[in-house]
Structure formats: C-alpha cells, structure tokens
Regions:
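Thiamine diphosphate
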Residues: 1-168, 175-177, 237-247, 260, ...
C-alpha cells in the first residue's frame, strides 16, 4: 500500500529512502492517501473524523480506515469516538491485535478484552469480531454498501488479529449469518450426546479444535457456530422484544439467536477472547442451558497457548 497509495506529506519526499529497492518502500508523496500519525491516537482519530464527515461538511464522500491497537481505541479516545457517532461519521475503525491472548507477551497494557463492550454503547457503531478473511470481506463490502450506496449514517468497528493461521473458503450461504451475527460453520453427527459450540475471533479456532476432541475422546457431537458479532445479536434481540411488546395481538417474532438454535440439541457454550460479559449479553434469547467462557482480568505476558490455558478459553476447557 505504501508504494501504491503513498504516505501523505505536504512537501513530498525530500530524501531517498534506504529501502527504495524493496516492494513496500517508505514512499512519501504530496498526493499520498495514507496518514501516518505515529503514537497519537487523539490526533489520528480527529483526522479520521474529518474524513468520515467530509460527505456532509465538504460534499465529498470518503470512507476512511483507521487501524490501531484495539486497546488504544475506545479505552483511550472513547470520548472522540462518541463525538464521531454524534457527528454521524461514516468509515471503518479497525482494532488490530485484538483479544486478550492474541498479542502474546505484551501484558495488561496492550491486551484488549473489552473494546466490543465499549463499542456497544455507541448507537450507530456496528461492530464485528470476525475470524476468517472471507468474513471480513463480507462485512467490509456490506459496510461500503450501507455507507456509500444507501447513505446510512453508521460507522464500523472491526477487530482483527495478528495471529497467522489458515483461512478456509467461505461456507455456502453464510453471508446473511455473517452480517446478522452468527452462522453455522459445521454440523456434527447424530449421536445421542450433542452440544452447540459458539466461537468468535481467533478463539473460534480453539472451538473448532474442541469439537474434534469431544467427538474423538468423549463421543459427543458438536455443531460449531461462528459468531461475528454478539453486539449485533443483542441489538436484534432487543428490537424483537420491543416489537413483541408493542404488538401484543400479533404473532410474536423470534430473535435471530432463537431462530438459529431453537431446533438444535444440547447445551450452548460460547468462547471468545473477550470478557464474559461480551458473549453473556445474548443469554435472554438462547434456548436451554448457556455457558460462557471469556478472558476476564488483566492481560499477562506469555505465549498464546499459555495465556489461553490461563484464561480457560482454550480447546481443553
């Protein structure tokens, strides 16, 4: 992106960068489209707000992407993000290195386990915690449609990780579920013992591994669900509750979570790289027993494997 788009500089590039022969050399240009703000979250977010409100202040449609450590977003400049919502901003906030355990070795100052709880408080912020690349692509594409084509006054908060792993091809027909908040990633067999496993973000991979362990070691079949947004599931549930309350003579509607799980057998277990409160917020609409695993507490400096064992969100829990 540096070579293609360039880093913005009002005076252009006044020197020859040392890495000029590299593919991603440090290219500065007075027409550059990347703002490199440095360790200045407040200034960077103000630049993002200026671009994300340009459609109304200057009549120019811009959809900015601001990438930052997720711990240093809502926690550090939450008041400015609230102002962005109040200003009807349109754009994408990308909380990188998200999750309490994905950023191994950097301790409690950098390991985020609650940004999605904070993002849920901003009414026009649509937030997602995807695991796979195709989920991210579907979310960004739909966000562009809503903000550019439909001119909706919403902005997106999406958490992404710095962990390397293989990404499968998209599940057939999964687009709607990705956007609404959850979809069936795989279905287990027809054994008598059955469980529903919900996973989000990087911990979804631990959930997939847990399903294998349950089948091979315990004779328990598991349906695996990818939950891209507990926040959107909660909002859907609240909307349905309100509609049912205001229309007592109509046929009651069912929340999307209920629609997904009502015909499935077994207890429901959710695991994320965030605090338990994140996945617990859909409890009212989960049929049957519901157990949540999360990363409550301060972050710690250790390897991912050890961190996930410590917070009890790995495949063995």
């Amino acid at each position: 992106m540096f070579r293609q788009l360039g880093i913005y500089s009002s005076v252009g590039q006044l020197y020859e960068p040392q890495d000029k022969d590299e593919i991603m050399y440090y290219k500065e240009d007075h027409r550059g489209q990347i703002l490199e703000e440095g360790i200045n979250e407040a200034g960077a977010l103000c630049s993002w707000i200026a671009a994300s409100t340009a459609y109304s202040t200057h009549g120019v449609n811009m959809i900015p992407f601001y990438i930052f450590y997720s711990m240093f977003g809502f926690q550090r400049v939450g008041d400015l993000i609230w102002a962005a919502g109040d200003s009807q901003a349109r754009g994408f906030l990308l909380g990188a290195t998200a999750g309490r355990t994905t950023l191994s070795g950097e301790g409690l100052q950098h390991q985020d386990g609650h940004s999605h709880i904070l993002s849920s408080t901003v009414p026009n912020c649509v937030s997602y915690d995807p695991c796979f690349g195709y989920e991210l692509a579907v979310i960004v594409q739909d966000g562009m449609r809503r903000m550019c084509q439909d001119q909706e006054n919403v902005f997106y908060y999406i958490t992404v990780m710095n962990e390397n792993y293989l990404h499968p091809s998209m599940t057939k027909g999964g687009e709607e579920g990705i956007l609404r908040g959850m979809y069936a990633l795989s279905s287990g067999g027809k054994k008598k013992k059955k469980v529903q496993l919900l996973g989000a973000g990087t911990i979804l991979r631990e959930v997939i591994a847990a399903a294998e362990l349950l089948r091979e070691d315990w004779g328990v079949d598991a349906d695996v669900w990818s939950v891209t947004s507990f926040n959107e599931l909660r909002r859907d549930g609240l909307d349905v509750e309100r509609w049912n309350r205001l229309h007592p003579l109509e046929e009651p509607r069912a929340a999307y979570v209920e629609q997904c799980l009502s015909e499935r057998r077994g207890p429901v277990i959710a695991a994320t790289d965030h605090m338990k409160a994140y996945s617990d917020q859909i409890r009212a609409w989960v049929p049957g027993r519901y157990v949540v695993l999360g990363t409550d507490g301060f972050g710690r400096s250790d390897l991912r494997k050890n961190l996930r064992r410590h917070f009890e969100v790995d495949r063995y829990h």
